[in-house]
C-alpha cells in the first residue's frame, strides 16, 4: 500500500478544495505573511500563466511556463505543471509535485555553481614562489 501524501493532515484532494484564505492558514508563518501581504505583479502573472497551462494540460497539450519569480509559494493549484525557473544563468526545468506544496519555488534550483579549485596561481601562497612558470 503506497503512502498517501498529506500536508498538515490534509490530503492533496482536500487541499485543492480549500480556498486561498483557508490554505494560507495552514502555511508556516513566513509563507503565510508573504501571501497575506498580497501577490507581487510577477507572481500574479505567474499564477495566471500556471492556470492557463493547467487548462492546456487537461486538454492534452504540454505547456511550459518560464519565470524569474523565485519567491512564489507553491500552491495546490500549481501541481502537475512544468515550469522553467531562472537560476541567474539559465532556465532549469521543474515539474511541480504535491510534496512541494508550501515551499518557495526558488528552493528547487541552485543559484550558485560549486567551486572547483584548480592549480594555485603565482603569488597565491608563499610556497608558490618556487613553482616553475609554464
Question: Predicted segment positions?
Answer:
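Compact, Lys/Arg-rich rRNA/RNP-binding cores from ribosome-related proteins
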Residues: 2-134
Amino acid at each position: 500500500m503506497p503512502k498517501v501524501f498529506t500536508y498538515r493532515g490534509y490530503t492533496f484532494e482536500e487541499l485543492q478544495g480549500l480556498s486561498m484564505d483557508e490554505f494560507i492558514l495552514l502555511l508556516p508563518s513566513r509563507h503565510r505573511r508573504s501571501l497575506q501581504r498580497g501577490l507581487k505583479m510577477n507572481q500574479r502573472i505567474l499564477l495566471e500563466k500556471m492556470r492557463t497551462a493547467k487548462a492546456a494540460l487537461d486538454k492534452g497539450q504540454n505547456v511550459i511556463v518560464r519565470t524569474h519569480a523565485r519567491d512564489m509559494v507553491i500552491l495546490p493549484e500549481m501541481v502537475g505543471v512544468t515550469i522553467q525557473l531562472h537560476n541567474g544563468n539559465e532556465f532549469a526545468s521543474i515539474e511541480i509535485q504535491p510534496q512541494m506544496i508550501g515551499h518557495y519555488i526558488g528552493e528547487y534550483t541552485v543559484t550558485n555553481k560549486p567551486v572547483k579549485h584548480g592549480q594555485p596561481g603565482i603569488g597565491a601562497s608563499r610556497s608558490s614562489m618556487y613553482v616553475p612558470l609554464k
